[in-house]
Design a protein with these regions (language model features):
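C-terminal membrane-associated helical module and adjoining short loops/tails
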Residues: 234-288
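"…together with the soluble PPM/PP2C metallo-phosphatase catalytic core" -> "…together
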Residues: 2-258
Length: 288
């Protein structure tokens, strides 16, 4: 019986959820940077929404990673690096980003022409922190490169799904659940706790996201993806990691050519999952 892993998962999920909710409540009263208007944006319906859910996820998941019992020092440092890199550079893009260059390819094309966009800063920054996090938990240069790409690539991919209410969190929960199950099956409380803390923090903020009161933004989505990428890098064997990395690369490349929103809308199963918990189009949101 995987009792130790279940306890580790429970501790991670509870700590992540409690810290994320506390952070969201605190940030809605006093934002971490600027005032409430600094974080206000317009969503896909043309309605006001706040990005403060992102910093709340970063703070909640980071706090859980910092205090969760039993974490080895290097893994704890790697988790903090991943969430800080994704959240910090994602937050920079949230606050200072412009839309003249879009997508991974767009930012790199602009960089090749000497234009340093906020997106390019984010790509380089998350790449560097992802590689640093991987170096703390990997053996040898090849593993470090694969794991670093997995952390950074997952951070970027998660952000590509943050275009509709709840979508990025749902994708995170669906991707993180198998990692949590694998850790529990092996009765590994450390890896179970790592996967669970990000899932707990994300699930705790899902009602705000589905209610269209808040969204993860780059800060939250990048941090969620980076943590799940780190969890995959320390939970899966090399074949599994390479398979996941290949999927991340393929989906990222596909996003430059196709719209994920159109693909999801055109598939009955994906569309049903995407709409689960969301308010009807004609219903007015209850903003808080």
């Amino acid at each position: 019986m995987a009792r130790r892993a279940l306890l580790g998962a429970l501790a991670g999920a509870v700590l992540g959820a409690a810290a994320a909710r506390a952070a969201y409540a605190a940030f809605t009263r006093r934002p971490p940077v600027g005032d409430a208007e600094t974080w206000n944006r317009t969503n896909h319906r043309g309605e006001p929404i706040t990005l403060l859910e992102g910093p709340a996820f970063v703070a909640g998941a980071g706090a859980a990673a910092a205090v969760l019992p039993g974490f080895p020092v290097r893994l704890r440092a790697a988790a903090l690096l991943a969430v800080a890199g994704g959240g910090g550079f994602g937050g920079y893009d949230d606050l200072y980003g412009v839309t003249s260059s879009k997508g991974f390819k767009g930012h790199l094309t602009a960089l090749s022409k000497g234009e340093v966009t906020s997106g390019a800063v984010k790509i380089i920054g998350i790449g560097a922190t992802g590689l640093a996090a991987a170096a703390l938990t990997s053996r040898g240069g090849a593993d470090t490169a694969v794991n670093g790409a997995l952390v950074a690539g997952s951070a970027n991919l998660a952000n590509l799904f943050d275009l509709r209410p709840g979508r990025a969190i749902k994708v995170g929960l669906l991707c993180g659940a198998p990692l949590l199950a694998a850790a529990v099956r092996r009765d590994d409380p450390v890896r179970a706790g790592l996967a669970a803390l990000s899932l707990g923090a994300a699930a705790a903020l899902l009602p705000e996201d589905l209610g269209e009161r808040a969204m993860l933004g780059d800060a939250g989505a990048n941090a969620l993806g980076a943590l799940l990428g780190l969890a995959a890098s320390v939970t899966l064997g090399r074949p599994g990691r390479l398979a996941v990395l290949g999927t991340v690369v393929a989906l990222t490349a596909a996003s430059e050519k196709i719209s994920f929103t159109r693909v999801i809308a055109g598939n009955p199963v994906l569309h049903r999952i995407d709409m689960l918990g969301r308010r009807p189009v004609e219903q007015a949101p209850g903003h808080r």
